[in-house]
Amino acid sequence: MMDYELTLLSEGQIWGNDKERQLDVIRKYGIKAAITDLCILTGGYLYENTNYTIDEDRSLTGRTSCFWTRSDDGDNDVREVDADGERVDIYRYKRYDAVRPALRSSVIFSQISPNRVSGYNGTEEVEFGEYPQNAADSRMQNILESEYKRGMSKTGRSYTFDSVTDYDRDTGFKPVTYEEYEYQEKAYIRIKANFYCDGNKFMLSNGAYYRNGDYVWVEVSPVKWLIDDENNQLISKKGLVSGIRFLDKRTNYKGDFDRTEMKEYLDRYMVKDLFQSVDFEYLQD
């Protein structure tokens, strides 16, 4: 794999502070981030109605939630962005925040620049990599389940998340891996819902309700990134996954992001999952 690094945005990059100024692309786009259905299915905190949405999208696909930053709160825990874009704190051992990655790569940034397009409120964006994001519609859910029982074609790709619930504060990362299937030239995973609140039902972006333990077909689609020209980095427009613990509760967080469980997940799993479909030889030409 080429020289890719995933990280999270800092408190200063998001809001601005005495050490860093707010990123221009965040100032234009807004601080809030929408979450994917995969975020909800992997334990993200969901605000059920559409009162909490990004400015760009007031529909079910624009619903916001809390997402991690890489900054400490000065009291051994982590700074987060809440569903309204406010600066709040979260215990380092919680799992319900969304992961909104930023991609750093000195090589890739110049290669993908020709594919940039105009985005919301003067921003520019680009599609790069693929990831499971939103649930297929109800009709397709039934079709895919029937095809699955008959035997569907696998692509050879897979995606790894954490199987531990948010309420378990003692257990470390326990990977669960979902294989990717192909149907009519589209890719999907069949994931078991691991909702934040066991026993509740949640409406996904397809308008259907699901309960904890239900299997849901989620389409794999291109990831959209905001282009941060100031820092040669790409910032995911959405929170892509939840359920990942930031740090063991026995370890205080003092801002050393490289030593966190979150960074280990980004490096070991997420960066590979996001870009496994990328043609690296083409990008090097």
What do these predicted regions represent?
Residues M1-D285:
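Collagenous Gly-X-Y triple-helix signature in extracellular proteins
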